[in-house]
Design a protein with these regions (language model features):
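Periplasmic-binding protein-like
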Residues: 91-100, 119-120, 299-305
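Cap/lid and interdomain-hinge subdomains that line or gate substrate/regulatory clefts
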Residues: 63-70, 120, 127-257
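Short, acidic/small-residue loops that bind anionic groups at enzyme active sites
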Residues: 100, 108-132, 140-151, 324-337
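N-terminal glycine-rich anion-binding loop in soluble enzyme alpha/beta folds
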Residues: 12-72, 219, 226-272
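Extended hydrophobic packing segments that form well-structured cores
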Residues: 399-497
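Long, internal scaffold/assembly segments composed of regular secondary structure
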Residues: 257-346, 350
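N-terminal export signals
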Residues: 1-14
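C-terminal catalytic subdomain
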Residues: 327-442
Length: 497
């Protein structure tokens, strides 16, 4: 167990009478290591120590009557040891800061029943934070409040709610106070007027007819349980392929053609940073390999287990630039062999006659009333192959700072529609947001489209446990056609905002 200052957590000490007036707050940072030692959000090599110091200094300054007991934990076992120490000298409550995505620290803390404040370090712990928070909300866990804000003051103000417990309030009183505070500190809706954007749509019937002729390649993984439901309900054929077939196509790619494609990317990009010409040529060869597999199998889309393939040495270039090119041309390049998201892309790209879907790992920032859609693959032709292009940059893949990936600087002022299709449940998850800008925060994925959600941002915290982290975003007001598609299929639409 490592304390926030890099020292071991302080041993339990004798309780002093003057301590009884102070709020004893255990702070647990859920993370792999003080300096990140592996590829994950936010990125390899990230130094959490200055962030931790900033959090603790802000709390100490604003809450002089608090005794802070900081520690780091990478999972349930480490957490259990810390909680065991706390039994000897009980604390009044817990602050759990999710610094990396999936470290399961908050769960054993919540089980204690003590007042617990759960906080996201945005663009770092957001995946786990959203999924775990949704689990707490679904189970109506009575002792866990949460904060998801880029504004440190919002965290500090929520921490002050622990004083309620010290004065005799219950854990439920504490949670209600944090929820009230979060709503009060979230800005009201802005101007939701959007720029005109006429979408050329197929009818639901014609869309479904075309989907029955479509094939999706799933390379190196995927969810076998969903494939049959995709075929039965949408008519899309999903063909599973091994990494070996993609790697062979990559090895056989025409080097001169790859060099020419890479030069084209260099000329088109607004900026290139930390990506060598050789790496870009490897990415172009991977694009040619993707195209070769699509042609070989007569497919219109491909989704690759890119992280497992690259980290495991099964593939030797990231597919991100190839997906960028495919999505720009009206075909489908889908991340992480996420079949659900790839099928969502196929369905709506077909219905909109070429508009690309943007798979993302979203982040919610209540300080700005925004949902930020983040990933390292994105199109720069949001209105379809014949539509306008937006600027893009070529950077490394964020988590490991290797390879080549895309930062697409997407247009502001447009209505967007975000979806996930669940054929196995006959459901469509749906929300909309107005595009209001792009975040250039260095942490986490390169493309970060900022949207102001239509509806209730509080409601947006609720569905991540059932649907996972990924969402697929399209430019355009697609509410009516999505509901019409659901009606044609006999499916239910779940509005998550």
């Amino acid at each position: 167990v490592v304390g926030a200052t890099g020292l071991s957590a302080a041993p339990a000490r004798a309780f002093r009478l003057e301590d009884s007036a102070k709020v004893r707050l255990r702070i647990l940072y859920a993370l792999h290591a003080p300096v990140q030692d592996r590829p994950d959000w936010p990125n390899i090599g990230f130094d959490f120590r200055p962030v931790i110091s900033q959090i603790e200094n802000a709390i100490r300054q604003a809450c002089p009557n608090f005794e802070l007991l900081p520690a780091m934990a990478d999972g349930p076992e480490t957490t259990a040891k810390i909680l065991q120490e706390d039994q000897a000298n009980p604390v009044d409550g817990y602050l759990v800061c999710q610094m990396n995505c999936w470290n399961r620290v908050v769960q054993p803390v919540a089980e204690l029943g003590k007042p617990t404040l759960y906080a996201d370090f945005l663009f770092a712990g957001s995946g786990g934070f959203l999924v775990y928070t949704a689990q707490f909300l679904r189970r109506n866990v009575p002792n866990v409040g949460f904060v998801s804000s880029s504004r440190l003051e919002d965290l500090v103000e929520a921490v002050k709610c622990f004083e309620i417990v010290k004065k005799g309030g219950t854990a439920a009183d504490f949670v209600a106070a944090t929820a009230k505070l979060r709503r009060e500190r979230t800005p009201g809706p802005g101007d939701m007027t959007c720029k005109p954007d006429q979408v050329q749509l197929l009818s639901p019937e014609e869309c479904l007819r075309q989907l029955r002729e479509i094939k999706l390649l799933a390379v190196g993984g995927g969810w076998p349980g969903i494939i049959e439901a995709v075929k039965n309900s949408l008519g899309i054929t999903v063909l599973s392929l091994p990494f070996q077939e993609l790697n062979e196509a990559y090895q056989q790619a025409d080097k001169d053609a790859a060099r020419e494609i890479a030069r084209g990317w260099e000329q088109a990009a607004a900026r290139i940073a930390d990506v060598s010409p050789e790496v870009l040529e490897q990415s172009a060869a991977m694009y040619l390999a993707e195209k070769a597999l699509l042609q070989k199998h007569g497919a219109q889309g491909i989704s690759i287990n890119c992280l497992g393939g690259f980290y495991g040495g099964h593939i030797h270039a990231y597919p991100c630039m190839g997906f960028f090119e495919l999505n720009n041309s009206g075909l489908i390049g889908g991340c992480e062999c996420d079949i659900r998201s790839a099928v969502t892309m196929l369905a709506l790209t077909t219905m909109t006659q070429g508009r690309p879907g943007f798979i993302s790992d979203p982040v919610i920032d209540t300080a700005k009333r925004q949902i930020i859609y983040a990933h390292c693959v994105a199109s720069n032709k949001q209105f379809g192959p014949q539509g306008a292009s937006n600027p893009f940059e070529i950077l490394t893949h964020s988590e490991d700072r290797k390879g080549a990936a895309v930062r697409s600087i997407m247009p502001e002022g447009y209505m967007t529609t975000t979806l996930e299709l669940a054929p196995e449940r006959e459901q469509i998850l749906f929300h909309q947001a107005k595009s209001v800008g792009n975040s250039f925060e260095d942490r986490a994925c390169r493309t970060k489209l900022c949207g102001e959600p239509v509806g209730d941002i509080e409601k947006l915290f609720a569905e991540w446990d059932q649907w996972g982290w990924h969402r697929v975003t399209f430019y355009g007001d697609l509410k009516e056609p999505v509901f019409a598609l659901a009606d044609a299929l006999g499916w239910t639409v779940i509005e998550e905002a």
